[in-house]
Amino acid sequence: MPTRNLLLGSILLSLAVKGDPGPHRGARCGVSPLGSATELNYLSRIVGGRESKKGQHPWTVSLKRNGKHFCGGTLVSHCHVLTAAHCLLDRNVKLYMRVYIGEYDQILKEETEQMFRVIEIFKHPNFNQSQPMNYDVAVLLLDGSVTFDENIQPACLPNPDDVFEPGDLCVTLGWGHLTENGILPVVLQEVYLPIVDLSSCLHVMSALKGTVVSSYIVCAGFPEGGKDACQGDSGGPLLCQRRHGSWVLHGLTSWGMGCGRSWKNNVFLPHNRKGSPGIFTDIQKLLGWVSSQLNTAVPNKNQESCSMQDGVLSGKSGELIFLKNPMSVTRTMSGAPGFSLSLKTCTSCLNFTHLDIESDFACNLDYLAIYTDSHRLIGKFCGDIPPRSLLISFSSIKLNFFSDFHENRTGFVLYYSAVEPNTYPDSGCGSFAVLFEEGEIQSMNYPENYLSNSRCHWIIHGPSGSYIKLQFEDFALEPSDDCRSDYLAVYQDLAAEDKIETFCGFSLPAPVYSTTAVMHIKFSTDERDNDKGFRATFTFVSPNSLVEDSRQGNMPSTNKKETTAQDSICGVSQVPPIFIYNSIAKVEEAVPHSWPWHTSLQYAGEHVCDGAIIAENWILTTASCVLNRKFNDVWLVDPGIHDLLRPGHNQKGLVKQIIPHPSFSSQTNDFDIALVELDESLQFNSDIFPICLPGKTSELAPASLCVVSGWSLRGKEAEKSTKLQQREVPILTDDACSAHYIQNPGGITDRMLCAGIGTGQDNDSCSEQSGSPLVCLLEKKGIYTIFGIASWGVNCKENSKPGIYTKVSPFIDWIRQIMSDTGQIHSNLGDPKPHPMGNIEPEETAGRDIIQGGFPTNDASSNQNLYIASSCEDVVLLQSPGEIKMETKSQMYPNGFSCQWRIIAPKFQIIKLVMKQVHMSAENGKCCNSLIIYEGISKNKTLKVRFPTDEMVPGTVWSEGSSVTIESPPHPVDPEFGFCLVYSFHSRTQSQDHVVPDSDSSEP
């Protein structure tokens, strides 16, 4: 069969942006010369009307009348400022208004200031003075060009695909009143607020008479109030930070009912006390209009043209569509310029021959984005290194080019063609590349999260005799042990058999070198926990250059985990925490071992609650976790663990004693704190390290942002994660906390604190996350300190109410006293003496019977009374000797019932099981009924023996460790089913073969 030529069309698209780049020189939108403000500010104070640092927000503008500030604004180009239209109602405002850029102190005349007049004002045509919060935006054209320096930079306008979600933390700035009708500040203030869901905001606003709002707004604030923008802040920016650092003008301060009022119960408040979230004009939704003003508002600006005849497409807004006949062209206007290629039943091949787009680490300034026809992002490209031979396994793709207004480049040139779908093997992720020249590769969708269940391949061919160097610029893949989840594997042969290395996690890998002229790269993802992926460049190097690097000691070494202890004594992590989202509404997986003080507390082999390491022998947790689980030998502390389903660190600790606070009340949850002393000291390293305790008088300011970590942070109704999660939560005022829990017995006491956000919905108080540490970064010291322990109501339902934490500072003296009495065995747990708060009956353990009794001091096979366990569903047996007996003839069991017994011996002892009798009907014995013995009691228990086995009844089974599980699986009721088993504890020297048929089993 002859080969068909499937080249449906080839066209040169060249986008050139014209204009003089001179005025923009030195501009870098959204980048603060002082660096990111989030590292410590988010973790110390997210709100609070505090003074900003001079130069921290170099795009902030002060509009003045007769030398006095009246509104704010934001610099977005060398000659444009965005502000609120309602600030400009006076028809003569252009005559007296002065624009101050680089302003910080309203009294001092600073060298950083630049002052301009306004030559033109462009208000949105839909702005209506009678409804001032709708379309409340205006563009000011300055009478000169701003000189950019370290104190003056423009903010980034939002991209069409920027996403800022409810709960994301953004900052608003201004010189407005510090309180409602209060004084004006002298220097620039900053207030961090979470984005509020638009539907919730509109619902709140509906309770305010006379307010008419549209969907062209952004809402931000706390339902409890306390922090907000205020009078004089109008027109100022609401800036949100992209994941990669640049600040985006998300909104303009427009309106609010009062300043910092609570709005969570507006319906029940009189009108003069009603509040609202802060209302900001949504710049992204009005980006088309804003862009058109920035394009047309420059005098003598060369207008750009669009021409298909000469193959050059220029202009900031347009769409080029190739229909079935690829030479049939239409052009339509849209918010973002773009081109669509439709190649029916074929695979699209894009070959860039030129790329010159403003370079940015995450391609957020100017970029070319490639999408599928369903708007699934394939990749974003910028800089001057063209991607090579991009094969996209979709027949229809869309190319969108976006440019801000700061740095002009020549654009890009690409050829597209259609190839047979089977010309290259399908990668399963939408792209496959065979590369013959030096260049750059990146994961699909980068820098946004890559897709699930993807299999991507790149094959790089270097010149004969050369080696290939792969240099990573960015790297963030789901971390996992041995990189078994998401991973990037690098090989040095076509068959992908000679592996160089496999990578995952968040650490930037060292450069990778092949020792052949071929490098094969595989990128594989599973179904969950996606991240932003990677970007890397590859170059061809000679073998001689590698030899020279090796001699000079410049060859990279494999990344090895450091296990040396930190110089600090507490509160420092060698693995820095990473927050993908600047949000108080999102739970995300923690970087493994980034919270090295977090530990799992396990009872009878199962994780039951969390704790925090505070010393080599001590764990801090809640009394509610340990009160009804009274047997020390059943407890296990597992530090340094990230995934509950995978083996953690080898320092699992046995428990010496458990000490709940003597005043703990299960009715009020007051004094909910406990200490666990380990039998042996922990050895601190990078995975296991203590958290710092606060001072006795340490207090957190309201709205301080702290972090809670744990395995159940996604809420009671959500699937629990086996991997450690983290979440940023704000500290609430005592009054706001009490308002959420009016019905709580005993109220919110001085020994409790509230953290998180809530909608005020009903919440069944629970302890799903009991014991999880609430830690805060102390800005001055740069260390983490534990201020709270999750007590109850923490994430029982998603965001329903703030969680209640035990405040640690009031208990510092008690903690120190207990820890100083190291040799004393405290008897707070299970103490027969009256409880200081009155006699408290132990709460029932749902679905489990714990057979109480102390461990024998001598060999358990000595003559003692035989303990008979008659319960069935989930029984923990700690007393020896004992008997398990079950008779369906004398009990009424429903169809499908199941039973489980867990026998736990003291440490260093094993268990002897003697099966006396097993009987059942002949018919059920063939198919259904059985009795199974497992080694161990956790989810990782292993099958040991299954009964009935005629030759083993009667018979003896010896355990290998100190615990076994006996199960009777679900089955239909068998009136003849029953068994009798006796057990006893022994030292290891007394064990026989693991399964021995008995000729005489009269003794257990």
From Swiss-Prot:
S-S bridge residues: C71-C87, C170-C240, C201-C219, C230-C259, C363-C382, C429-C456, C483-C504, C609-C625, C706-C776, C737-C754, C766-C796
Organism (species): Xenopus laevis
SMART domains: CUB, Tryp_SPc
Catalytic activity of the protein: Preferential cleavage at 371-Gly-Ser-Arg-|-Trp-374 of glycoprotein gp43 in Xenopus laevis coelemic egg envelope to yield gp41
Record SUPFAM superfamilies: Spermadhesin, CUB domain, Trypsin-like serine proteases
Major location category of this protein: secreted
InterPro entries in UniProt: CUB_dom, Peptidase_S1_PA, Peptidase_S1_PA_chymotrypsin, Peptidase_S1A, Sperma_CUB_dom_sf, Trypsin_dom, TRYPSIN_HIS, TRYPSIN_SER
Domain called CUB: residue spans: 309-419, 429-541
Function description: Converts the glycoprotein envelope surrounding the egg from an unfertilizable to a fertilizable form during its transit through the pars recta portion of the oviduct by selectively hydrolyzing the envelope glycoprotein gp43. The egg envelope is converted to a sperm-penetrable form, via an increase in sperm binding.
EC number(s) from the headed UniProt entry: 3.4.21.120
Propeptide: 20-45, 584-1004
Polar residues: compositionally biased ranges: 547-558
GO term, biological process aspect, one: proteolysis
PROSITE patterns on file: CUB, TRYPSIN_DOM, TRYPSIN_HIS, TRYPSIN_SER
Classification of source organism: Eukaryota, Metazoa, Chordata, Craniata, Vertebrata
Keyword Disulfide bond set for record: yes
Gene Ontology CC terms, in alphabetical order: extracellular region
Tissue/organ expression: Specifically expressed in the pars recta oviduct.
Annotated Peptidase S1 domain residues: 46-295, 580-820
A Pfam family the protein falls into: Trypsin
UniProt protein name: Ovochymase-2
Domain of life: Eukaryota
